[in-house]
């Protein structure tokens, strides 16, 4: 039977990779809904190719433009817009599988709606777990949803773990690998002069600009540690980070008998996406087979927390509990946006997050409203902190 997909964030890099896999297996997968924020032209092209029942965009103006283009092309795809429309297509009876690939906090509500509707969720939006881990996992359990990780690291861990609970599997720890990003060997004193274009040039992966900056600061890896905690039920002291510049080993699981299982593959997001789409089966992802003889050398090193303070801040937030992770994520989103807009220096991203967490009145959230409130408070605090920072130099901003 065909799986019917709602693809949240179809115009991003994860969306592109997902649709590439779908194209290879039309007998297995059909598209119910595609969503984008404002990239209407690309969404129209996707709709004309995959003929979804529904297309969702962020605002009325984009919706009107998309609908006009679709009607002119003879498409019957219905067009909706706004936050509620995202929730609606995520819980719709027209789909059984939701690929959650919206970047940032905007992906929380539709991902949670999919969980509460008992959907099969392919989770690429790590913020859903970073912001509301306990709430999200409770919804998955209580409503019979199936949660499959799409992030390459978490998908690798999932493949290396037994199907029963972590506490019964003899697991000693999980090891999340990281490339180290574009600045792994760059002199720390020069990081203040990093430009957005430099930060977005990842050595191994093709990603969107926001996640590329997160990789450059290693905040992305910190968020992945938090996500791993919720996905696999392990405390922070049993989750290690290991720098692996070649991005061939995507993560490892260490067992109490001394065994270590690892998942290897070329750095291509189509592999974990295809695994999650077809699970428990396997399908062709269009990815070349790994040639270890050609690679020849795999190297590893411990992370430098002084070079990457965002990684340390994320682990601190996980250990603090409460709404600290939600505040961390919100402050980081504001800071990264400011950096990409050339309003702050690269090094000010960590400074902003640190300032927000230092001023946080932490508390245990009683529900989603508390999480959303903490997110809003952190965004205001981050914005206020950034407004007080000196503007970057003219040379850098040019």
UniProtKB/Swiss-Prot annotation:
Its EC number is 1.1.1.267. NADPH binds at residues 11-14, 38-39, 125, 127, 208. Pathway: Isoprenoid biosynthesis; isopentenyl diphosphate biosynthesis via DXP pathway; isopentenyl diphosphate from 1-deoxy-D-xylulose 5-phosphate: step 1/6. InterPro entries: DXP_reductoisomerase, DXP_reductoisomerase_C, DXP_reductoisomerase_N, DXPR_C, DXPR_C_sf, NAD(P)-bd_dom_sf. It comes from the Bacteria. Its cofactor is Mg(2+); Mn(2+). It is an enzyme of class 1 (oxidoreductase). It catalyses: 2-C-methyl-D-erythritol 4-phosphate + NADP(+) = 1-deoxy-D-xylulose 5-phosphate + NADPH + H(+). GO terms for molecular function: 1-deoxy-D-xylulose-5-phosphate reductoisomerase activity; manganese ion binding; NADPH binding. GO terms for biological process: isopentenyl diphosphate biosynthetic process, methylerythritol 4-phosphate pathway involved in terpenoid biosynthetic process. PANTHER family: 1-DEOXY-D-XYLULOSE 5-PHOSPHATE REDUCTOISOMERASE, 1-DEOXY-D-XYLULOSE 5-PHOSPHATE REDUCTOISOMERASE, CHLOROPLASTIC. Belongs to the DXR family. Catalyzes the NADPH-dependent rearrangement and reduction of 1-deoxy-D-xylulose-5-phosphate (DXP) to 2-C-methyl-D-erythritol 4-phosphate (MEP). This is 1-deoxy-D-xylulose 5-phosphate reductoisomerase. The lineage of its organism: Bacteria, Pseudomonadati, Pseudomonadota, Betaproteobacteria, Burkholderiales. The gene is dxr.
């Amino acid at each position: 039977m065909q799986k019917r997909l709602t693809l949240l964030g179809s115009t991003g890099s994860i969306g592109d990779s997902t649709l590439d896999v779908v194209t290879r297996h039309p007998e297995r997968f059909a598209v119910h809904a595609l969503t984008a924020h404002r990239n209407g032209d690309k969404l129209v092209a996707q709709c004309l190719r995959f003929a979804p029942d529904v297309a969702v965009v962020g605002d009325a103006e984009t919706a009107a433009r998309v609908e006009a283009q679709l009607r002119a092309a003879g498409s019957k795809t219905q067009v909706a817009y706004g936050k509620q429309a995202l929730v609606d297509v995520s819980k719709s009876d027209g789909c059984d599988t939701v690929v959650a690939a919206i970047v940032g906090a905007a992906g929380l509500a539709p991902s949670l709606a999919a969980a509460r509707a008992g959907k099969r969720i392919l989770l690429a939006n790590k913020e859903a777990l970073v912001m509301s881990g306990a709430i999200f996992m409770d919804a998955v359990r209580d409503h019979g949803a199936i949660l499959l990780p799409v992030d390459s690291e978490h998908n690798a861990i999932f493949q290396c773990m037994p199907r029963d609970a972590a506490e019964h599997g003899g697991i000693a720890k999980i090891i999340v690998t990281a490339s180290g990003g574009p600045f792994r060997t760059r002199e720390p004193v020069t990081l203040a002069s990093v430009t957005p274009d430099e930060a977005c040039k990842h050595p191994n992966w093709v990603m969107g600009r926001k996640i590329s900056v997160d990789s450059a600061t290693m905040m992305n890896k910190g968020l992945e540690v938090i996500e791993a905690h919720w996905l696999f039920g392990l405390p922070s002291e049993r989750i290690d980070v290991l720098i692996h510049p070649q991005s061939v080993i995507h993560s490892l699981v260490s067992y109490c008998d001394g065994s270590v299982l690892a998942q290897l593959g070329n750095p291509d997001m189509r592999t974990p996406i295809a695994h999650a789409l077809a699970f428990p089966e396997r399908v062709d992802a269009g990815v070349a087979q790994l040639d270890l003889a050609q690679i020849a050398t795999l190297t590893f090193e411990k992370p430098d927390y002084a070079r990457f303070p965002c990684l340390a801040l994320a682990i601190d937030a996980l250990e603090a509990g409460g709404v600290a992770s939600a505040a961390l994520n919100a402050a980081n989103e504001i800071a990264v946006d400011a950096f990409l807009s050339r309003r702050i220096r690269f090094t000010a991203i960590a400074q902003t997050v640190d300032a927000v967490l230092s001023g946080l009145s932490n508390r245990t959230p009683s529900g989603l409203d508390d999480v959303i409130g903490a997110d809003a408070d952190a965004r205001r605090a981050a914005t206020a902190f950034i407004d007080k920072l000196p503007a970057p130099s003219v040379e850098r901003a040019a």
